[in-house]
Amino acid sequence: MNEREYIGRGRRKLEHLRFFQEDSKGSNGLEDVHLVHQALPELNWSDIDLTCRWLGKTLAAPFIINALTGGPPETLAINAALARVARRTGIALAVGSQRAGLENKEWRESFTIVRRENANGLILANIGAGNSPADAGEAVAMIAADGLQVHLNAAQELIMPEGDRAFRGWLENIRGMVNTLGVPVIAKEVGFGLSRETALQLYQAGVRIMDVGGRGGTNFAAIEERRRGRSVAALAGWGLSTAVSILEIRELGLPVEVVATGGIRSALDAARALALGAKIVGAAGYFLKILLEQGEDALTEEILQWQEDLKRICLLTGCTTPAELATKPVVITGQTRAWLEGRQRH
């Protein structure tokens, strides 16, 4: 990569950071998922345990600060703060795409800082599916990661004028990562959701953890329109919502873990996703906005509030753990129900 391309990649990352703060408030479909209140839960507050084991480590709650940024020097302080917040709240953290750090050694510190600030935490590396297994291994080693997010961002690339246009071979790259890396590989969409067809392809390639990255959160079509003043209205509503994506995977009945991301903005959203069958729930843009506008302490307090709210929801649905939410009744209405009914016919 030449100097001009370095500058272009860095500028794009910083522009995305700025626009991430402008929450699109799109529908993630989880408003269609209704938990059933139990007036006689027969539980005490002390009975509720939010801790969970994931990727060999114990989390204080089934939450992750999802992939955001890294690369240009301006991102170092952001990643350092996110790592400290994850450590203080006992939840997982994923870095943004490490492609920039692989290509420019001067930018690696913006990624390695997370392990220095959170030495024992659960941290995920991140790289695109267009990269080789060797590059993926380097990304994992860079931050001593507990797992690798391999992001599937074809729609995002097509929206960006400077984005990639070659996507053949991605599945083989993923298969190679699964077979050669010594850590779990998590296939991750970045805002357009996962269909059952894609989930089956990933499963056949050996992937056992899928991050749905559903529609309803960061809207790259809207971001690109603001970045470039270039309309991409045809893709403005493209993709599968977070709720639909979780259900698409669940309908396959495969032994996979689902990470629910895409427009998660509250503990209630998280509880709804867990009730649909997710194991872990994450947010990216929502957390970033709080960090940049209110500071590190405010983000820490917000996540701790989510944990307390999730504990309340567990008690009021008769659950002693978040995992039990998946065994409780839910009512699905609206567009999500319409999607499920339509999919059964086609």
UniProtKB/Swiss-Prot annotation:
Annotated Mg(2+) binding lies at 157
Record-linked HAMAP family: Idi_2
Reactions catalysed = isopentenyl diphosphate = dimethylallyl diphosphate
Main localization, broad class: cytoplasm
GO BP, one example? isoprenoid biosynthetic process
Q: Which organism is it from?
A: Moorella thermoacetica (strain ATCC 39073 / JCM 9320)
**Would you say which domain of life the source belongs to?**
Bacteria
As cofactor, the record names: FMN; NADPH; Mg(2+)
Under InterPro entries, the record lists: Aldolase_TIM (IPR013785), FMN-dep_DH (IPR000262), IPdP_isomerase (IPR011179)
* E.C. no: 5.3.3.2
Give the protein name, as stated in the record. Isopentenyl-diphosphate delta-isomerase
What does the protein in this record do?
A: Involved in the biosynthesis of isoprenoids. Catalyzes the 1,3-allylic rearrangement of the homoallylic substrate isopentenyl (IPP) to its allylic isomer, dimethylallyl diphosphate (DMAPP).
Localization per record: Cytoplasm
Keyword annotations of the record: Cytoplasm, Flavoprotein, FMN, Isomerase, Isoprene biosynthesis, Magnesium, Metal-binding, NADP
Instruction: Output the Gene Ontology cellular-component terms.
Output: cytoplasm
The keyword Isomerase appears for this protein:
yes
